[in-house]
Regions:
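Acidic, serine/threonine-rich low-complexity disordered tracts
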Residues: 1-33, 74-156
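Hydrophobic, well-structured mid-protein blocks that either form specific transmembrane helices
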Residues: 23-63
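Short, polar/charged, low-complexity connector loops/linkers at domain or secondary-structure junctions
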Residues: 64-74
Length: 156
């Protein structure tokens, strides 16, 4: 779960709750509270980190920020963000790789393929879906995950 708001035209996370369950066992249970106006964040009511950016994002809200930034700057090749997780605050880059036609549910979708070396993932953004990721591919040492957008409803 990710909760945030826009401050001075920047998306900011305020609360990030991540629970990972594998084979019925809780693997991760992290709660991160971010105080953008005070420039710090706290994880699990224990560790405190200073924030250094006008916008600190979590692992979910970074995709909203990327979608918004690509809409504003479609010709930009690299987008950089400060992203917080249980390990701390890290710089994350999304680099434009190429344009790609993908197929989801037998529908051809024109997309921009972006790569994030830090997150070990690639994603496809589509103008038809307000540049939200329509496919996210993540490969780590043990697993390969693919998330595919299954529903999209634009708010009025």
């Amino acid at each position: 779960r990710s909760i945030g708001l826009k401050i001075d035209n920047y998306i900011n996370s305020q609360y990030y709750d991540l629970v990972e369950i594998s084979k019925g066992k809780i693997e991760k249970n992290n709660k991160i509270r971010i105080y953008p106006d005070k420039n710090y964040a706290i994880i699990n009511s224990e560790k405190r980190w200073e924030t250094i950016s006008k916008s600190t994002l979590d692992e979910l809200s970074v995709y909203l920020a990327l979608a918004e930034d690509v809409q504003k700057n479609p010709n930009q090749d690299v987008f950089t963000y400060q992203v917080i997780d249980e390990k701390g605050i890290n710089q994350v880059n999304f680099k434009f790789e190429n344009y790609e036609t993908i197929i989801i549910n037998n529908i051809e979708i024109e997309s921009m393929k972006m790569i994030s070396p830090e997150l070990e993932l690639s994603l496809n953004l589509s103008k038809a879906f307000n540049f939200l990721p329509v496919i996210i591919n993540r490969v780590n040492k043990k697993n390969h995950y693919q998330l595919t957008l299954s529903q999209f409803k634009e708010l009025p």
